[in-house]
Amino acid sequence: MTENTKTHVILLSCGSFNPITKGHIHMFEKAREYLHKTGRFIVIGGIVSPVHDSYGKPGLVPSRHRLTMCQLAVQSSDWIRVDPWECYQDTWQTTCSVLEHHRDLMKRVTGCILSNVNTPSTTPVIGQPQNETSAIYQNTVNKSVAIKFWGKMSESLGKICCVRPHMDRFTFVDENANLGTAMRYEEIELRILLLCGSDLLESFCIPGLWNESDMEVIVGDFGIVVVPRDGADTERIMNHSSVLRKHKDNIIVVKDEIDHPMSIVSSTKSRLALQHGDGHVVDYLSQPVIDYILQSQLYINASG
């Protein structure tokens, strides 16, 4: 497959990130590596979307802290960014609504072709960029081309930073412009996939926890990339849910022959390590995140 015929993917991870750990970043990296190895996908960006303060989880620190920690955790990455939209809303948003927001945002801002899992590639949806948004293409030697789209993102200001392999410049499509018969559109299929661990996948099997229509949209329209933790049996998990069984082909399980130590890192372990003064916290959290936590006195006296 050529680069333009491969499915271009943005990985979106929703969660508390309380705090964000090295395991979260490892999940992004492993998913991108695995998707590239399949030869069917090109991962052009990753989005970290922390949950709203009203989520109600015990011990959840305010979003201003979680957003800052997430930004510190990804500051050295050239393809993962933090998105504050979910935190800036008036109330908690479902995972389904977050996915739909980013799909609609990409249509408006990037001008790329957005499609659901079940959308035929012969009938792509072409996004129309906003007039005030310009694209900056930065070429680097032996690296991907970083594309940064600046502008107003819904009701908040932010940045979309996507990375993709070198290719000819993408043609933005303005349906209101008189482009003439000579204009050719470069069609690049773009999908937003939910990135998660096996614990979130298993939560789909808990009766009443998820709205079934939301599950249909998440798994059936968008699709999921699962990075298993602690040797979880994803096959068994999927067989316990009718929705997961129905859309099994839309669930990509990242297979790894080697159990990486980052796969057992969790926010809970990190908080406990902080509370107990455990030096192993450096194995769980990046140093900038640790420094911020200590400076802000987070989690030190919190429970769980």
Curated annotation (Swiss-Prot):
Keyword Ribonucleoprotein: no
Single annotated GO MF: protein ADP-ribosyltransferase-substrate adaptor activity
GO cellular component terms listed in the entry, alphabetical order: axon; cytoplasmic vesicle membrane; Golgi apparatus; Golgi membrane
Signal peptide, first to last residue: none
Keywords for the protein's UniProt record, in alphabetical order: ATP-binding, Cell projection, Cytoplasm, Cytoplasmic vesicle, Golgi apparatus, Lipoprotein, Membrane, NAD, Nucleotide-binding, Nucleotidyltransferase, Palmitate, Pyridine nucleotide biosynthesis, Transferase
Binding site for ATP: H24, T268, K269, S270, R271
Gene3D superfamilies cross-referenced by the UniProt entry: HUPs
Pfam families, A to Z: CTP_transf_like
Any GO BP: NAD biosynthetic process
Pathway stated in the Swiss-Prot or TrEMBL entry: Cofactor biosynthesis; NAD(+) biosynthesis; NAD(+) from nicotinamide D-ribonucleotide: step 1/1; Cofactor biosynthesis; NAD(+) biosynthesis; deamido-NAD(+) from nicotinate D-ribonucleotide: step 1/1
EC number: 2.7.7.1, 2.7.7.18
Compartments, as annotated in UniProt: Golgi apparatus membrane; Cytoplasmic vesicle membrane; Cytoplasm; Cell projection, Axon
Annotated NAD(+) binding sites: S16, F17, W92, T95, G197, D199, L209, W210, R229
Reaction(s) catalysed by this chain's protein: beta-nicotinamide D-ribonucleotide + ATP + H(+) = diphosphate + NAD(+); nicotinate beta-D-ribonucleotide + ATP + H(+) = deamido-NAD(+) + diphosphate
Broad class of enzyme this protein falls into: transferase
Entry membrane topology: Lipid-anchor
Chief localisation class: Golgi
Sites of S-palmitoyl cysteine lipidation: C161, C162
SUPFAM superfamilies cross-referenced by the UniProt entry: Nucleotidylyl transferase (SSF52374)
Classification via InterPro entries: Cyt_trans-like, Euk_NMN_adenylyltrnsfrase, NMNAT_euk, Rossmann-like_a/b/a_fold
Subunit (UniProt): Monomer.
Purpose of the protein: Nicotinamide/nicotinate-nucleotide adenylyltransferase that acts as an axon maintenance factor. Axon survival factor required for the maintenance of healthy axons: acts by delaying Wallerian axon degeneration, an evolutionarily conserved process that drives the loss of damaged axons. Catalyzes the formation of NAD(+) from nicotinamide mononucleotide (NMN) and ATP. Can also use the deamidated form; nicotinic acid mononucleotide (NaMN) as substrate but with a lower efficiency. Also catalyzes the reverse reaction, i.e. the pyrophosphorolytic cleavage of NAD(+).
PANTHER family, sorted: NICOTINAMIDE MONONUCLEOTIDE ADENYLYLTRANSFERASE (PTHR12039), NICOTINAMIDE_NICOTINIC ACID MONONUCLEOTIDE ADENYLYLTRANSFERASE 2 (PTHR12039:SF18)
Protein's UniProt name: Nicotinamide/nicotinic acid mononucleotide adenylyltransferase 2
Originating organism: Danio rerio (Zebrafish)
